[in-house]
A protein has these predicted regions:
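C-terminal cap/linker of serine protease catalytic domains
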Residues: 13, 130-133
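A short local loop/turn or secondary-structure capping micro-motif enriched for an aromatic residue
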Residues: 41-44, 65
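Short, well-ordered secondary-structure micro-motifs within conserved domains or adaptor modules
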Residues: 45-49
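Metal-coordinating catalytic core of metallo-dependent amide/deamination hydrolases
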Residues: 133-143
C-alpha cells in the first residue's frame, strides 16, 4: 500500500485558534503529500475510511525516563542499588531492555512521535533509539 487516502477524517492542525475541519489525506510511501478539502482525491489509491476520527500532528514529550512508567512511586527507593541488581544477571539485563523498549512503544501508541530522554538505565535509551532508527523496533523518534 504505497499510495492511499485517509478519508473522512477531522483535522486538528495544532495551529493557534485552530478550527477542526473535514479533509482527506493523501499518503505516498509513508509521507503525507496533500490534504484534500475539495473531495477530489486521486483515483489510483486505496482508501481507508476514518469515519469522522480525529487526525493531529504527533505529540512531543520533552522529559522522559524510559525505564519508568510515569506513575508516582508509593515509597522512595534506592534506584542505584536496584539498577546494580538488575544489571547483575543476563535475565535482568534482558528484562530491563524489554521494559525500556516497551515504554518507548507505549509512547508512540499514545500519539507521541518524538521524545527527549533525560536519564535512563545505563545505555538502554541509546540502544533503543538505534533499534528504532534501523527499523528493528517500533517507537518514537528519540533525541
Amino acid at each position: 500500500m504505497n499510495k492511499y487516502i485517509l478519508k473522512n477524517g477531522i483535522i486538528l492542525d495544532g495551529s493557534e485558534n485552530m478550527k477542526p475541519y473535514k479533509a482527506d489525506i493523501f499518503v505516498n510511501n509513508g509521507i503525507i503529500e496533500d490534504i484534500i478539502t475539495n473531495g477530489k482525491s486521486p483515483s489510483e489509491c486505496s482508501e481507508i475510511d476514518l469515519d469522522g476520527k480525529y487526525i493531529m500532528p504527533g505529540l512531543i514529550n520533552m522529559h522522559v525516563h524510559l525505564a519508568g512508567n510515569g506513575k508516582p512511586q508509593k515509597k522512595q527507593r534506592d534506584n542505584e542499588k536496584l539498577v546494580k541488581k538488575v544489571f547483575a544477571t543476563p535475565i535482568g539485563r534482558f528484562a530491563a531492555t524489554k521494559l525500556v523498549e516497551n515504554y518507548a512503544k507505549i509512547e508512540l501508541m499514545s500519539g507521541v512521535t518524538t521524545i527527549r530522554t533525560v536519564g535512563g538505565l545505563r545505555d538502554l535509551d541509546t540502544k533503543t533509539r538505534d533499534k528504532i532508527n534501523k527499523g528493528l523496533l517500533d517507537g518514537p523518534r528519540i533525541i
